[in-house]
């Protein structure tokens, strides 16, 4: 056993004494030691209940003959961090989570790992750690929050962000906003749409690192607790067979994840995180690969924010496996890959089927012939930008309008709420990239303000920052190179005419090459906003969004 290095032989008597100081018995130490990374906290609704799942996981480990050893992991609530300095830390914590889980596992020589995340950066951070550590591992997520029906409308957190915009526009009363506030988030779980957390939980299942149902079983269902027990039992099988993440997370597995990503219409953050996870294994996922997979993958789902359905509806319609079964009908997936279930994907989806074709479209009658995410390139974004095209109003798929330029999210929000943005405008928010932010903040507040004020079908937003999975409209992010590195987005001037053609994959400003060169010659990089502490270090080490914003 890997753990023998901390428990076997006379030389390890001091080590065993320390274990015994915590109550471990000789019998427990003779079994495989399984690290359990519990990210429970009292600041994230998606994590408030993870102590219950952790106990279920540990019960499963014990039932299968192992000894669970729990430790804590950090996590940021993106919703609470949204729209202020706190959001600068969100993406940066992905690396902290990966590093700290690596340190705990390596320092104590665990035989296997169970990772218990749920929300935005915790899921990819733990998957990065699993790939890096490369010992038998499994992920059991906390599950999605339920969406509550209120006055005939399904509510979610995004309903409230947009309600603030509606209130500012004078189309909603304070009492109406208060009512949504009290009911939009009815309990524990990751926010209920196909936002970033649920996107990554679903893709964890597709990658093969989670059990069937990991992405869609609601947080409050007893089935989620049973799944956690099975995950605890399953890790012992993976340890016995020495099935490691590198056996599961192959190039083909990432192609599957991107394919299902496009079919589900996942958050654009998924194409930031999947390359980062793959990078841990020496696998390259670039925007060209993403674009190629999107071009051949039909979009089968329009879940919130793209449509009215939520993750609980996807669960009722057959879950992720049902979507995979549809894709398999057109040979769009690699089916003979090993997964954490101990079975192949082909075996996992053998009995899966769509139970409601209103929620999951047939492969023969998709919402669109191409995927939910599109990659754009042009003289604003020569290295690429991404947009969740499944959440873009049809009239905005092709758009031309004047640039309204802001050098921070805060400036843009002030302008939007004060009525300075008009129909047809293209809002440019720059110096919010991985280095410039630093931390590549999510722009949910400005996109929700635009939507809440009734402008989401008339105004586009382009940024070198990112978007929440809850953002909708012509929200084009991850513009690379970013402004802080002298990317062309730094050269856009107020009033420049911007051409957006999402179907053609193009994004340009109507400015000559000669003028762009002239502007670049006079451009000077602004002073870094933060130079000390973790964010100062992060800004110096982080790479482009086009390669996953990993640290080098």
Curated annotation (Swiss-Prot):
Entry GO terms, CC: cytosol
GO molecular function: 2 iron, 2 sulfur cluster binding; dihydroxy-acid dehydratase activity; magnesium ion binding
Taxonomy, superkingdom: Bacteria
Residues annotated as the enzyme's active site: 468
UniProt EC number: 4.2.1.9
Lineage, uppermost ranks: Bacteria, Bacillati, Bacillota, Clostridia, Eubacteriales
Modification sites for N6-carboxylysine: 121
Catalytic activity: (2R)-2,3-dihydroxy-3-methylbutanoate = 3-methyl-2-oxobutanoate + H2O; (2R,3R)-2,3-dihydroxy-3-methylpentanoate = (S)-3-methyl-2-oxopentanoate + H2O
Keyword Magnesium assigned: yes
Name recorded for this polypeptide: Dihydroxy-acid dehydratase
Cofactor mode of binding and number, as noted: Binds 1 [2Fe-2S] cluster per subunit. This cluster acts as a Lewis acid cofactor.
Annotated function: Functions in the biosynthesis of branched-chain amino acids. Catalyzes the dehydration of (2R,3R)-2,3-dihydroxy-3-methylpentanoate (2,3-dihydroxy-3-methylvalerate) into 2-oxo-3-methylpentanoate (2-oxo-3-methylvalerate) and of (2R)-2,3-dihydroxy-3-methylbutanoate (2,3-dihydroxyisovalerate) into 2-oxo-3-methylbutanoate (2-oxoisovalerate), the penultimate precursor to L-isoleucine and L-valine, respectively.
Residues bound to [2Fe-2S] cluster: 119, 191
Family membership noted in the UniProt record: Belongs to the IlvD/Edd family.
Annotated PANTHER family: D-XYLONATE DEHYDRATASE, D-XYLONATE DEHYDRATASE YAGF-RELATED
């Amino acid at each position: 056993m890997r753990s023998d290095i901390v428990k076997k032989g006379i030389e390890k008597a001091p080590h065993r004494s320390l274990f015994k100081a915590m109550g471990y018995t000789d019998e427990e130490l003779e079994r495989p030691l399984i690290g359990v990374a519990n990210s429970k906290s009292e600041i994230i609704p998606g994590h408030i209940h993870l102590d219950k799942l952790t106990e279920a996981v540990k019960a499963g480990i014990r039932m299968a003959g192992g000894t669970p050893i729990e430790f804590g992991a950090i996590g940021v609530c993106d919703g609470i961090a949204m729209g202020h300095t706190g959001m600068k830390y969100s993406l940066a914590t992905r690396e902290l989570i990966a590093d700290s889980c690596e340190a705990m596992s390596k320092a104590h020589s665990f035989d296997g790992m169970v990772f218990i995340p749920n929300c935005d950066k915790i899921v990819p951070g733990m998957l990065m750690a699993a790939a890096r550590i490369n010992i038998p591992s499994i992920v059991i997520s906390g599950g999605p929050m339920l969406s509550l029906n209120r006055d005939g409308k399904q509510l979610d957190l995004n309903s409230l962000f947009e309600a603030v915009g509606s209130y500012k526009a004078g189309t909603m009363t304070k009492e109406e906003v208060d009512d949504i506030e009290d009911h939009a988030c009815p309990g524990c779980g990751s926010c209920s749409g196909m936002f970033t957390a649920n996107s990554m939980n679903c893709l964890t299942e597709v990658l093969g690192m989670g059990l069937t149902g990991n992405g869609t079983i609601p947080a409050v269902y007893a089935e989620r607790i049973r799944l956690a027990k099975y995950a605890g039992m399953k890790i012992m099988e993976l340890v016995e067979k020495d099935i490691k993440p590198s056996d599961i997370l192959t190039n083909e597995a990432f192609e599957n994840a991107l394919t299902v990503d496009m079919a589900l219409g996942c958050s654009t953050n998924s194409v930031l995180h999947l390359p980062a996870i793959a990078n841990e294994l020496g696998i390259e996922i670039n925007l060209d690969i993403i674009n190629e997979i999107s071009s051949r993958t039909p979009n089968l789902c329009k879940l919130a924010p793209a449509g009215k359905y939520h993750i609980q509806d996807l669960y009722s319609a057959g879950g992720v496996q049902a979507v995979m079964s549809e894709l398999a009908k057109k040979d769009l997936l690699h089916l003979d890959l090993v997964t954490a279930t101990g079975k192949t994907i082909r075996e996992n989806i053998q009995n899966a089927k769509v139970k409601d074709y209103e929620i999951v479209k047939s492969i023969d009658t998709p919402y669109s012939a191409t995927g939910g995410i599109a990659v754009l390139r042009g003289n604003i974004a020569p290295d690429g930008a991404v947009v969740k095209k499944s959440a873009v109003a049809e009239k905005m798929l092709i758009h031309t309008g004047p640039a309204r330029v802001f050098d921070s999210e805060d400036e843009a929000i002030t302008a939007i709420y004060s009525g300075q943005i008009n129909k047809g405008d293209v809002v440019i928010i720059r110096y919010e990239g991985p280095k410039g932010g630093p931390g590549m903040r999510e722009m949910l507040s400005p996109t929700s303000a635009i939507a809440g004020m009734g402008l989401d079908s008339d105004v586009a937003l382009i940024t070198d920052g990112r978007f929440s999975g809850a953002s909708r409209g012509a929200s084009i992010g991850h513009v690379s190179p970013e402004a802080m590195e002298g990317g062309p987005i730094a050269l856009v001037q107020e009033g420049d005419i911007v051409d957006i053609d999402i179907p053609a994959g193009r994004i340009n400003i109507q400015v000559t090459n000669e003028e762009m060169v002239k502007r670049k010659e006079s451009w000077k990089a602004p002073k870094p906003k933060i130079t000390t502490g973790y964010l100062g270090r992060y800004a110096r080490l982080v790479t482009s969004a086009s390669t996953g914003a990993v640290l080098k």
